[in-house]
From Swiss-Prot:
<keyword id="KW-0460">Magnesium</keyword>
<feature type="region of interest" description="Interaction with substrate tRNA">
    <location>
        <begin position="37"/>
        <end position="40"/>
    </location>
</feature>
<keyword id="KW-0808">Transferase</keyword>
<comment type="subunit">
    <text>Monomer.</text>
</comment>
<dbReference type="GO" id="GO:0006400">
    <property type="term" value="P:tRNA modification"/>
</dbReference>
<feature type="site" description="Interaction with substrate tRNA">
    <location>
        <position position="103"/>
    </location>
</feature>
<dbReference type="InterPro" id="IPR027417">
    <property type="entry name" value="P-loop_NTPase"/>
</dbReference>
<feature type="binding site">
    <location>
        <begin position="14"/>
        <end position="19"/>
    </location>
    <ligand>
        <name>substrate</name>
    </ligand>
</feature>
<dbReference type="GO" id="GO:0005524">
    <property type="term" value="F:ATP binding"/>
</dbReference>
<feature type="binding site">
    <location>
        <begin position="12"/>
        <end position="19"/>
    </location>
    <ligand>
        <name>ATP</name>
    </ligand>
</feature>
<comment type="function">
    <text>Catalyzes the transfer of a dimethylallyl group onto the adenine at position 37 in tRNAs that read codons beginning with uridine, leading to the formation of N6-(dimethylallyl)adenosine (i(6)A).</text>
</comment>
<protein>
    <recommendedName>
        <fullName>tRNA dimethylallyltransferase</fullName>
        <ecNumber>2.5.1.75</ecNumber>
    </recommendedName>
</protein>
<dbReference type="InterPro" id="IPR039657">
    <property type="entry name" value="Dimethylallyltransferase"/>
</dbReference>
<dbReference type="Pfam" id="PF01715">
    <property type="entry name" value="IPPT"/>
</dbReference>
<keyword id="KW-0547">Nucleotide-binding</keyword>
<dbReference type="GO" id="GO:0052381">
    <property type="term" value="F:tRNA dimethylallyltransferase activity"/>
</dbReference>
<keyword id="KW-0067">ATP-binding</keyword>
Length: 314
């Protein structure tokens, strides 16, 4: 058995070509695709989360897709444990794990280890969520800035998940999230060698892809998907209820927005999210091969790079 076993990591913005690349690489390398997108973990949101199709999932093994009910939350620590189990299973089966997704925190937690942050007690979490429902994300961000200006400065005022997380940790521990993130990390898993790719398409093409994909989602049944989600009567603060497109289409179903306005708003939210992802991957993932997956020459070079490197260490 070799001292290290290969794991491919593919990150980048939404609509940036990650899933197609992962499928191609898994086919070329006898691989198993492992999901690292926090929203594609949820069951019942195949269309709106751009999860691979049933036909695509049948081409090569896919793991950690649609495994969590929308009524639950998923932490980076829990995902990491599940991902490591799937990576080990893939290696034991003689396959190459291809971990793909736009949730950068998941990818970093896997490759570099996870900050040892104390768990947030449920009463503190519930209080924070109630405050968020009362104030909204920008106002909660302002409160965070008053107590943790450095941490708030690193967060977009509209990033609900990260603002709420920072507020919960501050309330639960009395220390900013940044303190725990720099206090030390759990060690990265031994015996693995990570090859990291970051998809970086040009922004104009990326934003056009975001807009076009949302229109395809509507044609593929996104509205019906959200109608089924709404029928579950879930807490609107749950992560699944804040997936891209869900709040806007819920507003349309309530009669608050015409479909055209809901579509435009969701497209703008998707472009904003893609922009934040581009920035995050550029500054937070250092050791990566970055490329434009829409450039055939670059894509072919990356495919060869992966095949050559996996061959060397498998």
């Amino acid at each position: 058995m070799p001292a290290t076993r290969p794991v491919l990591l593919i990150g980048g913005p939404t609509a940036g070509g990650k899933s197609a690349l992962a499928l191609d690489l898994a086919g070329r390398l006898s691989g198993t695709v492992v999901n690292a997108d926090s929203m594609q973990l949820y069951d019942g949101l195949r269309v709106l989360t751009a999860r691979p199709s049933v036909a695509e999932e049948a081409r090569v093994p896919h793991r950690l897709y649609g495994i969590v009910p929308p009524s639950e939350r998923m932490s980076a620590a829990r995902w990491r444990d599940l991902a490591l189990a799937e990576i080990a299973a893939a290696h034991d089966a003689g396959r190459v794990p291809v971990v793909v997704g736009g949730t950068g925190l998941y990818l970093r937690a896997l490759a570099e280890g996870l900050a040892d942050i104390p768990p947030v007690p449920e009463p503190v979490r519930a209080e924070a969520q109630a405050l968020h429902r009362a104030l909204g994300t920008p106002a909660l961000h302002a409160r965070l800035a008053a107590e943790d200006p450095d941490g708030a400065a690193r967060l977009h005022p509209g990033d609900t998940t990260r603002v709420l997380r920072a507020w919960e940790v501050l309330r639960a521990t009395g220390r900013p999230l940044g303190y725990w993130q720099t206090a030390g990390r759990a060690a990265p898993p031994p015996g693995l060698r990570f090859l990291t790719l970051v998809c970086e398409p040009p922004r104009d093409r990326l934003y056009a892809a975001c807009d076009a994909r949302f229109l395809r989602m509507l044609e593929a049944g996104a509205l019906e998907e959200v109608r089924r989600l709404a029928a579950l009567g879930l807490d609107p603060g749950l992560p699944a209820m804040k997936a891209l497109g869900v709040p806007e289409l819920l507003a349309h179903l309530r009669g608050d927005l015409p479909l055209e306005a809901a579509t435009a708003t969701a497209q703008q939210a998707t472009r904003n999210y893609a922009k934040r992802q581009l920035t995050w991957f550029r500054h937070q993932i250092a050791a990566a091969r970055r490329f434009d997956p829409g450039d055939c020459v670059e894509r072919n070079a990356v495919m060869k790079f992966c095949v050559d490197n996996v061959t060397q260490i498998s």
